[in-house]
Amino acid sequence: MRSKLRVGLLLDGATVPYWAARSIERIARSDVADIVLAVIDGGTEKDVDPTRATESFLYDTHIWFDRRRNEQSIDPLALEDLPRDLDKVGRVYLKRTADTHRTISEEVVRKIYERDLDVLIDIGNVTPLGELSRCARHGVWSFSPGDGEKYDGHSPGFWEIYHNEPVTSAHVRRIIRGSTSIIYLSHSHTITRSEKRNREQLYLKGISFLPRLLNEQYALGREPLPSKESGTVATLGPLPRRGPGNLEMISFYLRRWPRDLHFLAKRALFEERWAVQYSLDSKIPSTYDGFNTLVPPPHTWWGDPQAAQQDDDFYIFVEELVLPRSRNHAHISVIKVDHDGIHEPPVTVIEKPYHMSYPFVFEWKGSHYMVPETSNARTIELYEATDFPYQWKLVKQIMNEVEAVDTTLVRRNGLWWLFTNMRENHGGPINDELFLFYSDDLLSDHWEPHPLNPIITDARSARPAGRIFELDGVLYRPSQDCARCYGYAVNINRIQEMDEKSYRETRTAYVEPKEFPGASRLHTFSHIHGLTAVDTYIARPRFIPNR
């Protein structure tokens, strides 16, 4: 059996932020790594708040208000004592000079080198580390918000909002013998209404990054992890981007206030609802002019349409929600559509005391099955039709104690493949990370996680958007583009490679809401032979009756 990776930690003192403590705990309790050394800076504690490195009064005021408006149950930057997992770990101490740079003597370097480390993980992430990078076989790794190039440094999460970037990124960089490269890169939707929330989502999601990379490094053995970029980032000096000044804050609010007023006015005057649109055509649509619209009653949503067929009739299963969302939870309904396009009113088929949506329906060995989204119950549930399409029974909880959304299954090469978006860390984003599992039995008690999980970590393409369909022997996976907002548009992705060790897909088409008049979002694409269904987010005037 292969020996565990030997890991050292670079720490700034006797405390670490919440996100780092959780990451350290996972590493210490993993099956692939042992923490064998803590290198502790003996100087003054540093402030981990990335917004403090500025002399702008307006920016400080902005931060003060943002914090009070957007308090969260978890502060990923709150300091806490080192995890107890480090109590028996050997320690080496550094000293800090007046210019705040670490002073590292050859004796200290030798002590670290003698520990025969595979990886050094820098939790401080604030000072040059080139001289330590030769002390570990795979260099020094550090997590940072930002994309590692354009956005990095002070006030992470602010500049992406300032420049109207649809995504805000986080990364892990590696330094080996003075050369820096990015080995992990993840993209989240930019939360434009709060810099604090935009930044914190990165730290909460980032709890998982270093443990994942250690798992990947363990599987590779002595082979280094591949870089996520074509070249290397040469600089090892202080990060280049400064905090915003007073003039930039004036510009920021002059542009932001009109957008905020427009948003508030639109929300006051219009009610936005999901509606279903469908086309009776066997082919994948190349244009969307001929789609029929199923408009729900006032104060009602019909979303996440999933198509099925029996005999000559089609059935569109939907999430049905009576507004307001704060007082109601959605259930699963079905709309019957005949071959002439005549539809019947929706019929409720599954209702539980928790939210249900995304009723993924499929057929196997003569029976119809459904996997609705039940993330509020922290389950992935499998139902079987006892009288299709109106009667269903729960036959299996595929997974428990998971926060998983939009689960989609496909049968390929003798295996069931289960795609689902998951939130691993409380408070982190749900739209960013796609996980893949496989099993040879639909009713299995164990679904094997793919070794590359998450196979996608990008809000622009991760979250499933409907049935995986086959065209000319090739599988295509619809996915949501959640960069601008949740469920903005749909990607059609060609699955180029999928087996127990690898997964690869490329986008071949992009369906935007502008294809459907009046729509501002589109987040489901369900195709079967003879019917394609989508859902669109359309604004309706609040004060016009029977609209």
Enumerate the predicted regions with their spans.
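Conserved blade-ending motifs and adjacent loop-strand segments that build the rim/top face
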Residues: 451-467, 501-525
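Short glycine/acidic-enriched loop and turn motifs that connect beta-strands
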Residues: 321-325, 375-378, 423-427, 482-485
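One-carbon transfer enzymes
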Residues: 1-356, 360-369, 381-386, 396, ...
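Trp- and S/T/G-rich repeat-edge/linker motifs of beta-rich repeat architectures
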Residues: 287, 342-345, 391-395, 448-451, ...
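Blade-level signature of beta-propeller repeat domains, shared across WD40, Kelch, NHL, RCC1
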Residues: 489-498, 516-547
